[in-house]
């Protein structure tokens, strides 16, 4: 006599319960939790740096940097004078809701308006696990190609916002912006899309204005 357990299903069910509890906790405390995902090198940290330049004097922000190892990104972000914590995943390619909760509590969330999780660079695993975030953001860089939403559907289905980054290299690459937008909206008709260049600051104002309005609405 034996029992068959669908482990993957059980893991996701447990995580979803944890995620909903964390979302409720964030709502009760007025903390907007932003989950930022992308492939390695798409520009997450540079985009966050630009975002901090615009918003750090307008709201209280905390940043959680998730990596398999190293603290390179945390060092970069901490230079902006915001609360920063490094989360090492111990080889795991994503964060789940419980890891995120531990990071938030360790960092201290009581007085924050915005908590940002820079997830592990990966277009597959992070999309599978609900972190308890208020909103999910995917960053897609021009060098990756305009077909990424077709190849990695779940990432773009779970995201509320997509930032098309590195627009400065557009003239040098075979990348169709309108086709990319079409592919994103094919996967997620409700996705908000911003064209940005974290290096030059192009489009960052529009992105930050949207984010600031979302944070205010969440806290009401």
Regions found by a protein language model. Name each.
Residues 88, 140, 197:
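Residues at the C-termini of beta-strands that transition into short coil/loop
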Residues 126-133, 142-190:
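Conserved C-terminal guanine-recognition region of P-loop GTPase G domains, centered on the G4
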Residues 2-37, 42, 46, 51-134, ...:
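Nucleotide-state-sensitive switch-loop elements of NTP-binding domains
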Residues 12, 90-91, 168-170, 200:
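Short histidine/acidic/glycine/proline-rich micro-motifs that form metal-
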Residues 67, 165, 197:
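Active-site glycine-centered loops adjacent to acidic/histidine catalytic or metal-binding residues
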Residues 47, 96, 148-151, 176, ...:
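Residues at alpha-helix caps and immediate loop-helix transition turns in enzyme cores, especially N-
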Residues 169-220:
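Canonical P-loop GTPase G-domain recognition
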């Amino acid at each position: 006599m034996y029992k068959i357990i669908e482990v993957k299903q059980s893991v996701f069910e447990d995580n979803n319960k944890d995620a909903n509890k964390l979302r409720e906790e964030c709502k009760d405390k007025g903390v907007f939790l932003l989950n930022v995902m992308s492939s390695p090198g798409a520009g997450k940290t540079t985009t966050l740096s630009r975002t901090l330049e615009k918003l750090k004097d307008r709201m209280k922000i905390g940043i959680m940097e998730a990596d398999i190892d190293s603290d390179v990104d945390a060092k970069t972000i901490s230079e902006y004078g915001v609360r920063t914590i490094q989360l090492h995943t111990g080889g795991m390619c994503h964060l789940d809701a419980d890891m995120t909760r531990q990071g938030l509590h360790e960092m201290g969330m009581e007085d924050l308006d915005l908590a940002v999780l820079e997830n592990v660079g990966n277009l597959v695993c992070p999309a599978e696990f609900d972190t308890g975030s208020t909103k999910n953001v995917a960053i897609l860089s021009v060098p990756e190609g305009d077909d990424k939403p077709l190849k990695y559907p779940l990432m773009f289905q779970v995201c509320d916002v997509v930032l098309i980054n590195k627009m400065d290299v557009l003239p040098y690459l075979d990348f169709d912006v309108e086709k990319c937008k079409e592919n994103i909206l094919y996967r997620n008709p409700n996705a908000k899309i911003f064209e940005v260049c974290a290096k030059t600051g192009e489009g960052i104002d529009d992105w930050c204005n949207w984010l600031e309005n979302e944070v205010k609405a969440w806290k009401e």
